[in-house]
């Protein structure tokens, strides 16, 4: 034991020097976790540090390797010191270098800790064992074998203790804690940790910083000694930890004990900095090292501190343990081997290494060794560490050690009880894995998760927590991990302020935590700011709300508790818990745990809680109960899908918690809810909460951050009364409901809530909505609550999105700053914008829609609230939301009911249009959005962008109608339909189509689904009916679209609701955007942004363009108006996304349209659709772009933003849900035409305004812009080879971007990822796809149309009618956007629709239908696509980009190749685009050009295929997911890609969408897609002969696209269109505008089929191979 003596002192000394090697230490610390630094440290530490690192990373191999080289040199050094050869004293080598310390110090700073850990293992495994006294002990290996597990114990005592782990015997009870331990040493440790912790905690809380310090003070009474002892113990502990790593089960507990003990020791030094200083004095470098350490990774700091204080070491060890944990299971054997071979007598440690009880024995041994060390090493530590007060220290250490050992023993026993469980063993690694994933806070979760199990229980709670919180608090969340480990060092060295807190075991930080609590509210913004720093939701939350939480957890229990209380101050329970823990950790834990369970988190985290029980539940439960749990749950709900436990928690916990929270919110009452929400914010946003209205942003962030919470937040908001909040929620619900998931809500809430604050209350009348909302609400709430329940596609998608995004957001996710952080930041940003945008963005889209609904319902409301209609709308929405205390429900209701309401008011929609002053306001919103968008976190929260701002403006041109269209994709389709209906004959009429608008609003709402397009048309007429139906049959909507135009409205209405779920419907509702926002909002950003502003994606981008657009189309103009805003908003999103700006001009409209609708859809059919191709269309990017914008943006901002934005987009794709119903997407489709309607009166004329007019122009505009925008988002095939052909078989457009199209299509395939979100919609898309214009060349126009087409679902039918061209454009767009978004659904529907080869009744779809289809399809697709993109991002498989890509390709590809990555390639080869005016394919040119148009730009002004596509699109838009691809190379590809992406939301599922079956023949008769069903689509090419020739146009495109699209049925993602469809888009433009026949060697023999009168066939051949990579790239992005 001589060695131990020197070892004890030596390590401190060494540790002291260690600080100097802070850099090495830092690397070491990092290396430890990463294992990369191991080698780095190795040289510096002479191999010691590396072993440590290795111990953590690869304890067995590396350790072994390192020790021999590194340790042997030490062996000589250690030899003298390590006479005792105690295992713990392998640290001796580290200590030994004390002399060389200064020199070595530079290197071994990390080694100190490393050495401690290494000391244990090295002695065990390397030559050190033999070199030191280990050999003898090693020789004993095998002597004492455990009869149960065969573990080799060096000593009988060890074996005895080890056996207890098997038998469960716990002969050493702790009277104080009532815990029995297997070993006396554990009991001692426990006393030192748990009992002392409790006492210390009590005293600490009572004394403040003094308590913990005093407790330690007892030990600190002999500062050097406690320190020495702490070090000695630490070293022993380190060894224990090292060995413990050997056994995963034991390792953690041992670590916990070590940590606890160390923590105790640390507090000693902490309380008495003198202690630290003394050692530091001994090793002057330590002081500098500390500062360095603070800078450096936590690991080094703890190492530095380890000499100074056991706590740092403990932290380090913990760290190591956490690091090791991941491979703990594997390591144990190796460790065991090591331990067995060279355990330096600590086979007990090896024992401890043994999974279950190893901790006890090792700890006991450790304790014994510590005692020995103290006895023998006590003097050493005195001189070695501080060289002073060895006797006093020794005495103090003895007592301390005894207590510590008791505590540790108890702790270990308790932990073992947990740890020994196989369950716990399994759990721990899982947790670690999650932590490692950076789920919550790598540092905190990572550390305390692992520690939780053991550390938190006793020592950790009090001590570690103290440092942890400080570190967390002071360090940004992103630094959270380092902070945690840094906690002491960072606090000590980096943050002096922190240091006292850190040192003060709990109270300082407790108070600090409270202080933080207060600051947190304000700080929430900061927190949010910080949060964004951390992509992960967990870290963000930990950082922000978890700023306290992480800090809390790490800090001493009191501190943690208090902090938790601070965080959970709002919730209250946590606070109580926080306070309680000081007194009774166990009781507190229990209470906290119970509270947790009550919260519903228990359900999600039952097992975890049990584990939590072991580790301080105060940390997890008190903090986690309200805060921590919430955070994690939110994370789970959020983008963070990575954390299964969390997800589970979210699933059950969230559902429980959500409802509970909702209940709490409800119970709390408005105010309480508000408070609660604030707490949530606190939890989520930390600082956001404080600001009531500022808070909303936080709130939003909160919502976003914690989808789970968002549900409750929403509820809170609703209850919170803050109508604004509610509205925010509602808005978000509409736009934010998704938002909750996405975080779109943030903006919505903030803007809505904020702006609406005042009138949110008035909107309280929203009860009106409330009632309505109530009905729908269930849908949202459920899904939302469910998180993954998918009770409502919308909600589900939202949740999913949130999870993903967040997780999205995951994130997401990404997120991934922690979604929390990111979201918070976003929220902050949003906050910025929200305030301006609030009403405008949110209200316009969501509130406005509701307002519009409300307004319409409460007609006076809009007027009442001048703020407008917008305000009114918002009010309404808000009231809706407000009334729906269950904001989620409200949101749903708003969305859903909204549509109904809207339906009613919509009819009054005329008033609604007036209301749509809201629209006017929306422009303001757009401005706000603009700011918002810019401000708004481009990422996840971009969703906010679509806050109907743009849509509002859009509505301006459209009048209410556009607003309505804007309202949501869903709404839009209706709107579009309405437009179409209204302006069917009069393309522009729709713009003024206030009348239709109302109807449309309803229609849109209803129509949003697929049907809406037709319905929209008729819906305008059916307005009221539609509203009703929309709300009712959203699902039907999807099919409806193809249904009769007249009925469709109603039918659509029904489907829209389902599709939009809430948002579409709501979009339709008063504010299309709003609803759409809801819809898209559902999709979160999408609906919200989409709905409200053009924000959805493209719209944002179009900020600038919209103005241009605005002029272009009356409708367009308005669109543009909003567009600018929209662009801003979308910009946020789009910008974030990629701002496919080339498309901006058209885009704005597109964006507007899209935004209005689903942004993507909206865009598609946005004005520019008509405009670009046509004058009006010129500025507008297409809806396609919108789609792409959603999809394409992904690439640009993609991953990170993709997660966030993407998710947001996805929400629009939530639309997945949207798409699912396709209502939203369809709605988008509707919008498509709407936009087009706006986009081109001329276009309308050209297109007859069927949705396509705007769409088409939009489409056209979109094409180029799409190309620009898409790429960033979906990697539109636009011209970029990156065409993200995610699923496209024809990887490359051989010829031109037909391949692009294909790729888009592939993208669409990729959509499947989204599909899962909104699976049900996929089929609808299908039709669209096939609808692809035969002459994709014309696809330009087709593309435009197609892009518009996304709206086709809603409006294709209507637009289709007269506006062949438009339809064509729409179709194309639709095709392009045809999104497999709801892959699953799509697949499902595909099956339905697959069968349904749309009859090639040119006449039938030839007109309206086709167009309608196209529009719907396009829009839907866009929606879907966007969604898909977003979804994709969230869903890796989805490759949301895919969609964009497809669309891009579509662009490039043009209609000719409407490759459907999905099996349903657009067979709509022909869309008799009756674009006589298609000649005005200026846009087309661009699109083509941009698309790298192989296809002649001018080629087909009218894409027959496009038209066909339109028809089909309409059909498919809904069904197939709006394959825009067909329609336009750009659009088509994009749309299709998007659709595909969307549809294939599930890679595999989505692919199924391959069904290329136009759900409704009506829409696209020509889609003769032999969809072999979702899956079968894989191989079957869609032979869609879209003989959609619009007789009216005189040109019927007989384009036949035989696309052998081998659907990768299951591989939705890579569904390559096997033979890209040869798109023989034969477009016989009325004007013989030669559709360029793109002669492409059909890589896959494309079946040319001329459908009736296919004048020109554009044969597009896609080369799968070539493009694949690019596609893939896109996908990757």
Swiss-Prot record:
Q: Name one GO molecular function term.
A: zinc ion binding
Where are stretches of biased composition, namely Gly residues? 376-385
Q: Which parts of this protein are zinc fingers (C2H2-type)?
A: 144-166, 172-196
Which InterPro entries does this entry report, sorted A to Z?
Znf_C2H2_sf, Znf_C2H2_type
Q: Which SUPFAM superfamilies does the record match to this protein?
A: beta-beta-alpha zinc fingers (SSF57667)
Where composition is biased (Polar residues), the residues are 1518-1531
Q: Which UniProt keywords apply?
A: Coiled coil, Metal-binding, Repeat, Zinc, Zinc-finger
Instruction: Kindly give the Pfam families that the UniProt entry links to this protein.
Output: zf-C2H2 (PF00096)
Domain of life where this protein originates: Eukaryota
Q: Where is the composition biased (Pro residues)?
A: 1-26
Residue ranges annotated as compositionally biased, kind Basic and acidic residues, are 216-232, 325-341, 517-526, 674-684, 707-727, 813-834, 1649-1662
Q: Where does this protein have coiled-coil stretches?
A: 391-423
Q: Where is the composition biased (Low complexity)?
A: 880-894, 905-919, 1153-1170
Disordered as annotated region, ranges:
1-43, 193-250, 270-398, 516-557, 663-931, 950-1062, 1100-1119, 1137-1176, 1216-1243, 1510-1597, 1620-1677
Q: Does the keyword Cytoplasm apply?
A: no
The name under which this protein is listed is: Zinc finger protein 831
């Amino acid at each position: 034991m001589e060695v131990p003596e020197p070892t004890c002192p030596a390590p401190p000394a060494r540790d002291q020097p260690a600080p100097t090697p802070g850099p090495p230490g830092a690397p070491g610390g990092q290396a430890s976790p990463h294992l990369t630094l191991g080698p780095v440290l190795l040289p510096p530490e002479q191999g010691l540090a590396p072993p440590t690192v290795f111990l953590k990373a690869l304890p067995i191999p590396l350790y072994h390797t390192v020790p021999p080289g590194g340790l042997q040199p030490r062996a000589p050094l250690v030899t003298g010191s390590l006479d005792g050869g105690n295992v713990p004293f392998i640290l001796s080598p580290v200590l030994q270098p004390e002399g060389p310390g200064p020199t070595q110090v530079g290197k071994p700073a990390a080694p100190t800790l490393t050495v401690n850990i290494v000391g244990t293992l090295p002695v065990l495994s390397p030559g050190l064992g033999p070199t030191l006294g280990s050999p003898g002990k090693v020789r004993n290996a095998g002597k004492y074998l455990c009869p149960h597990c065969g573990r080799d114990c060096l000593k009988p005592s060890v074996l005895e203790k080890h056996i207890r782990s098997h038998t469960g015997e716990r002969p050493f009870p702790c009277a104080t804690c009532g815990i029995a331990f297997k070993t006396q040493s554990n009991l001692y440790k426990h006393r030192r940790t748990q009992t002392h912790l409790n006492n210390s905690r009590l005293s600490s809380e009572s004394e403040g910083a003094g308590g913990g310090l005093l407790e330690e003070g007892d030990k600190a009474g002999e500062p050097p000694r406690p320190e020495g002892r702490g070090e000695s113990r630490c070293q022993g502990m380190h060894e224990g930890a090292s060995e413990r790593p050997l056994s995963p089960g034991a390792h953690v507990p041992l670590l916990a004990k070590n940590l606890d003990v160390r923590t105790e020791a640390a507090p000693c030094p902490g309380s008495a900095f003198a202690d630290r200083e003394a050692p530091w004095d001994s090793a002057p470098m330590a002081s500098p090292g500390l500062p360095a350490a603070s800078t450096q990774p936590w690991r080094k700091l703890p190492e530095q501190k380890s000499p100074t204080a056991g706590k740092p070491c403990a932290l380090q060890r913990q760290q190591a343990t956490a690091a090791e944990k991941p491979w703990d299971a594997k390591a144990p054997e190796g460790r065991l081997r090591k331990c067995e071979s060279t355990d330096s007598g600590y086979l007990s440690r090896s024992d401890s290494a043994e999974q279950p009880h190893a901790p006890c024995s090792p700890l006991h041994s450790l304790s014994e060794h510590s005692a020995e060390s103290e006895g023998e090493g006590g003097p050493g530590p005195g001189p070695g560490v501080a060289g002073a007060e060895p006797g006093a220290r020794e005495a103090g250490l003895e007592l301390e050690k005894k207590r510590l050992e008791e505590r540790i023993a108890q702790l270990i026993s308790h932990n073992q009880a947990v740890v020994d469980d196989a369950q716990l063993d399994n759990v721990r690694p899982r947790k670690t894995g999650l932590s490692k994933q950076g789920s919550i806070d790598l540092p905190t979760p990572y550390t305390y998760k692992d520690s939780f199990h053991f550390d938190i229980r006793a020592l950790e709670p009090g001590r570690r927590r103290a440092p942890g919180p400080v570190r967390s608090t002071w360090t940004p969340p992103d630094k959270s991990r380092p902070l945690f480990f840094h906690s002491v060092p960072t606090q000590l060295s980096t943050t002096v302020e922190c240091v006292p807190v850190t040192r003060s075991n709990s109270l300082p930080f407790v108070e600090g935590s409270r202080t933080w609590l207060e600051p947190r509210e304000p700080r929430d913004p900061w927190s949010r700011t910080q949060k964004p720093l951390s992509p992960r939701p967990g870290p963000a939350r930990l950082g922000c709300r978890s700023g306290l939480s992480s800090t809390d957890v790490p800090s001493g229990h009191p501190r943690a508790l208090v902090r938790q209380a601070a965080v959970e101050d709002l919730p209250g329970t946590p606070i109580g818990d926080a306070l309680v823990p000081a007194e009774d950790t166990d009781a507190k834990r229990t209470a906290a745990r119970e509270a947790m369970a009550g919260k519903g988190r228990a359900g999600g985290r039952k097992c975890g809680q049990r584990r939590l029980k072991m580790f301080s539940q105060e940390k997890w439960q008190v903090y986690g109960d309200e805060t921590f749990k919430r955070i994690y749950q939110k994370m789970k709900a959020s983008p963070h899908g990575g954390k299964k436990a969390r997800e589970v928690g979210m699933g059950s916990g969230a559902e429980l918690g959500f409802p509970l929270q909702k209940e709490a919110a409800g119970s709390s009452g408005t105010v309480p809810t508000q408070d609660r929400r604030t707490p949530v914010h606190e939890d989520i946003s930390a600082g956001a909460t404080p600001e009531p209205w500022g808070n909303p942003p936080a709130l939003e962030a909160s919502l976003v951050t914690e989808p789970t919470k968002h549900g409750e937040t929403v509820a809170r908001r609703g209850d919170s009364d803050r109508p604004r909040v509610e509205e925010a929620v509602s808005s978000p619900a509409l736009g934010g409901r998704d938002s909750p998931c996405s975080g779109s809500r943030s903006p919505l809430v903030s803007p809505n809530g904020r702006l609406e604050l005042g009138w949110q209350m008035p909107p309280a009348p929203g009860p009106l909505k409330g009632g309505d909302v109530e009905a729908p609400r269930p849908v949202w709430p459920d899904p939302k609550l469910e998180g993954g329940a998918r009770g409502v596609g919308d909600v589900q998608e939202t949740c999913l999105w949130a999870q993903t995004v967040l997780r999205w957001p995951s994130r997401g996710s990404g997120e991934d700053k922690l979604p929390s952080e990111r979201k918070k930041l976003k929220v902050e940003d949003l906050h910025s914008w929200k305030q301006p945008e609030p009403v405008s963005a949110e209200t316009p889209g969501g509130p406005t829609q509701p307002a519009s609904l409300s307004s319409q319902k409460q007609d006076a409301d809009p007027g009442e609230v001048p703020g407008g209609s917008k305000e009114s709308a918002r009010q309404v929405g808000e009231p809706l939301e407000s009334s729906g205390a269950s904001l989620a429900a409200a949101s749903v209701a708003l969305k859903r009911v909204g549509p109904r309401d809207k339906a009613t008011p919509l009819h009054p929609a005329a008033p609604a249009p007036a209301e749509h002053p809201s629209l006017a306001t929306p422009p303001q919103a757009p401005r706000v959005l603009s700011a918002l968008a810019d401000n708004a976190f481009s990422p996840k929260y971009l969703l906010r962008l679509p806050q109907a701002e743009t849509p509002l403006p859009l509505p301006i041109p459209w009048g209410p109608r556009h607003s309505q269209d804007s309202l949501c994709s869903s709404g839009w389709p209706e709107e579009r339909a309405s437009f179409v209906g209204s302006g069917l004959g009069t393309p522009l009429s729709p713009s003024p189509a206030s009348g239709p608008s109302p109807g449309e609003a309803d229609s849109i709402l209803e129509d949003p689904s697929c049907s809406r397009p037709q319905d929209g048309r008729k819906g305008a007429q059916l307005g009221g009916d539609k509203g009703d139906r929309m709300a009712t049959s959203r699902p039907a909507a999807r099919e409806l679209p193809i249904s009769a135009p007249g009925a469709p409205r109603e039918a659509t209405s029904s489907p829209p609701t389902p599709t939009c779920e809430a948002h579409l419907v709501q979009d339709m509702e008063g504010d299309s955007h709003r609803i759409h926002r809801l819809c898209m909002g559902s999709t979160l950003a999408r609906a919200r942004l989409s709905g409200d502003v053009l924000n959805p994606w493209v719209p944002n981008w179009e900020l600038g363009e919209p103005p241009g657009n605005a002029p272009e189309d009356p409708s367009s103009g308005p669109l543009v108006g909003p567009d600018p805003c929209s662009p801003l908003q979308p910009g946020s999103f789009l910008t974030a996304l990629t701002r496919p700006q080339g498309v901006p001009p058209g885009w704005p409209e597109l964006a507007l349209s899209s935004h209005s609708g689903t942004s993507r859809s909206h865009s598609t059919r946005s004005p520019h659709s008509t405009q670009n191709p046509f004058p009006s269309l010129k500025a507008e990017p297409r809806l396609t772009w919108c789609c792409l914008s959603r999809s394409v943006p992904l690439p640009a901002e993609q991953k990170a933003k993709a997660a966030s934005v993407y998710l947001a987009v996805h929400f629009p794709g939530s639309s997945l849900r949207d798409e699912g119903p396709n209502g939203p997407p369809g709605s988008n489709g509707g919008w498509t035409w709407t936009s087009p309607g706006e986009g081109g009166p001329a276009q309308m004329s050209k297109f007859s305004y069927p949705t396509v007019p705007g769409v088409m122009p939009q489409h056209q505009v979109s094409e180029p812009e799409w190309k620009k925008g898409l790429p960033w988002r979906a990697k539109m095939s636009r011209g970029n080879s990156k065409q993200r052909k995610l699923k496209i078989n024809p990887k490359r457009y051989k010829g031109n971007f037909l391949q692009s199209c294909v790729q888009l299509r592939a993208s669409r395939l990729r959509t499947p990822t989204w599909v899962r979100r909104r699976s049900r919609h996929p089929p609808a898309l299908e039709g669209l796809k096939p609808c692809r214009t035969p002459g994709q060349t014309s696809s330009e126009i087709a593309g435009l149309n197609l892009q518009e087409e996304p709206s086709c679902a809603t409006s294709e039918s209507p637009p289709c009618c007269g506006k062949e061209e438009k339809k064509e454009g729409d179709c194309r767009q639709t095709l392009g956007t045809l999104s497999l978004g709801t892959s699953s659904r799509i697949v499902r529907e595909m099956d339905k629709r697959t069968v349904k080869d749309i009859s090639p009744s040119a006449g039938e779809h030839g007109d309206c239908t086709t167009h309608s289809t196209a529009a719907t399809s396009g829009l839907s697709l866009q929606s879907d696509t966007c969604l898909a993109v977003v979804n994709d991002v969230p869903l890796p498989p989805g490759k949301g980009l895919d969609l964009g890509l497809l669309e891009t390709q579509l662009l490039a590809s043009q209609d000719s190749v409407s490759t459907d990555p999905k099996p349903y390639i657009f067979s709509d080869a022909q869309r008799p685009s009756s674009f006589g005016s298609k000649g005005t394919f200026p846009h087309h040119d661009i699109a083509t050009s941009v698309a790298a148009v192989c296809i002649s730009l001018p080629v087909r002004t009218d894409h027959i295929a496009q038209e066909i596509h339109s028809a089909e699109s309409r059909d498919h838009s809904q069904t197939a997911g709006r394959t825009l691809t067909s329609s336009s190379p750009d659009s088509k590809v994009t749309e299709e890609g998007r659709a595909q992406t969307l549809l294939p939301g599930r890679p595999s599922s989505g692919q199924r969408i391959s069904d290329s079956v136009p759900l409704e023949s009506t829409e696209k008769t020509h889609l003769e897609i032999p969809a072999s069903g979702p899956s079968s689509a894989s191989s079957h090419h869609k032979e869609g002969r879209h003989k959609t020739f619009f007789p009216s146009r005189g040109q019927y495109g007989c384009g036949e696209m035989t696309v052998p699209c081998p659907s990768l049925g299951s591989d939705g993602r890579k569904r390559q269109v096997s033979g890209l469809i040869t798109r023989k888009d034969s477009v016989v433009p009325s004007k013989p505008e030669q559709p360029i026949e793109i002669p492409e060697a059909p890589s896959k023999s494309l079946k040319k089929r001329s459908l009736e009168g296919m004048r020109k066939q554009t044969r597009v051949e896609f080369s799968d191979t070539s493009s694949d990579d690019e596609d893939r790239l896109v996908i990757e992005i």
